[in-house]
Design a protein with these regions (language model features):
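RNA-binding accessory domains that recognize and position tRNA/RNA substrates
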Residues: 1-210, 214-215, 229-231, 341, ...
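Proline-centered loop/turn at the N-terminus of a beta-strand
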Residues: 110, 177, 247-249, 265, ...
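Beta-strand-turn-beta hairpins that frame and shape the catalytic cleft
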Residues: 172-178, 285-288, 326-331
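Cysteine-nucleophile active-site neighborhood
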Residues: 214, 219, 224-301, 343-361
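Catalytic beta-strand/loop cores that center a nucleophilic Ser/Cys/Thr
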Residues: 287-329, 365
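A glycine-centered loop/beta-turn motif at secondary-structure junctions
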Residues: 323-365
């Protein structure tokens, strides 16, 4: 490996890691997190939930199979930055159309490779997620720390990634009309709904209950997304107004917002859950599901006791809440991603559950 480093990242605790720049050349302050997935870097880079975050990939080889046109989770990636051990700029894949570096450059996302990703990951695991600054090698540490301190923590992540006006994803022979609240929705969620006979109307995060009801939905979906759920309490208020009227299904941030709508509380995890192999127990069936996860916040289990929500899933690594349900209101949600691709398909049945609830609701209307 070369040793003429030209870029570095500086964490707010003063630690520095040197490497080589790739992608877009820019200095940027982000929150640093890590993901343990072996594959799926394209889906990670294009996941809106990583907005304002710099992701450390723990798997050492990244870029090997390039970028394909069909595997994006959003049209415009908004990840804050990417940190990898070894970057491969010569992909081998008959489907690839661009390199990872080209996609990062096109979307103004800085990357750095050649750093000790294991050491960084241990630091995040032991001390928690922190803010980080990616910059040139000759930037003084004191200047970098000053920039980190003076850069405000963003609270507009959802509004940054949500659509600005409604759009449609239709399928032939559809049976159900679903309105999806876009807090940073992944395209594979929409594909999963389309594949089950749903026409999907995607609306901005700040759409009113009255506007949603004008679409006469059979069900409402609250999407994943970035940031602190308490920054978008408007969506929780929306759930309060619509629960009991329509079946509602939420994923990730949507799960947290549904929980807030029922009076539960959320809190920030020390370093979050990000990877494709998190074991989750279904409390109704006793089965263990291997899940794909990407979140910094979780629902407080104690706060659920005073609500109408019942826990349905728990994480077997730390016993955090992974799913809740209010059968009376036909509302349920999970913290993880049942639509994950690439990733485990153990939880794809949750989309079928949503379909069945909508079917029963239409039959009993």
């Amino acid at each position: 490996m070369k040793n003429d480093f030209n870029r570095k990242i500086v964490l707010e605790d003063g630690s520095e890691y040197y490497g080589y720049g790739f992608g877009y050349h820019a200095d940027r302050v982000c929150e640093i997190v890590f993901n343990t997935s072996m594959v799926g870097y394209q889906e990670i880079v294009s996941d809106p939930s990583y907005t304002y975050q710099m992701v450390v990939m723990t798997y050492p080889l990244i870029g090997n199979y390039g970028i394909t046109d069909e595997d994006f989770e959003t049209k415009v990636p908004t990840i804050g930055g990417l940190v990898v051990r070894e970057y491969n700029d010569l992909p081998s894949n008959f489907r690839y159309t661009k390199t990872l570096s080209e996609i990062l450059e096109e979307n103004k996302i800085p990357g750095i490779w050649g750093v000790d990703t294991r050491k960084i990951t241990r630091s995040i695991r032991d001390l928690g997620s922190r803010r980080v600054y990616i910059t040139d090698i000759d930037t003084p540490k004191e200047e970098a720390l000053k920039i980190i301190k003076e850069t405000p923590v963003p609270t507009d992540a959802v509004s940054k990634v949500s659509c600005k006006k409604r759009w449609y994803s239709r399928t032939s022979n559809h049976k159900y009309n679903v309105v999806a609240i876009d807090c940073g929705i992944k395209l594979n969620i929409i594909r999963s709904l389309n594949a089950r006979g749903c026409n999907v109307t995607v609306v901005p995060w700040n759409t009113t209950a009255e506007e949603i009801e004008m679409h006469e939905p059979d069900g409402i979906f609250i999407s994943n997304g970035p940031g602190d759920p308490e920054d978008v309490m408007q969506v929780a208020e929306l759930v309060r107004k619509l629960k009991g009227k329509y079946p509602i299904f939420g994923i990730c941030l949507g799960h947290q917002l549904i929980s807030l709508a029922y009076g539960a509380k959320t809190y920030k995890l020390k370093f979050g859950h990000r990877g494709g192999n998190h074991p989750v127990k279904n409390l109704e069936t006793g089965k263990i599901e291997i899940t794909s996860q990407n979140h910094s916040y979780a629902v407080d289990s104690e706060s659920l006791k005073n609500t109408e929500l019942v826990p349905t899933h728990i994480n077997l690594l730390d016993n955090t809440i992974e799913g809740v349900e209010c059968k009376k209101d036909r509302v349920f949600s999970v913290q993880y991603h049942p639509e994950s691709a690439p990733g485990p398909q153990d939880s794809a049945y949750l989309f079928d559950k949503f379909i069945n609830i909508m079917k029963e609701s239409k039959e009993n209307a």
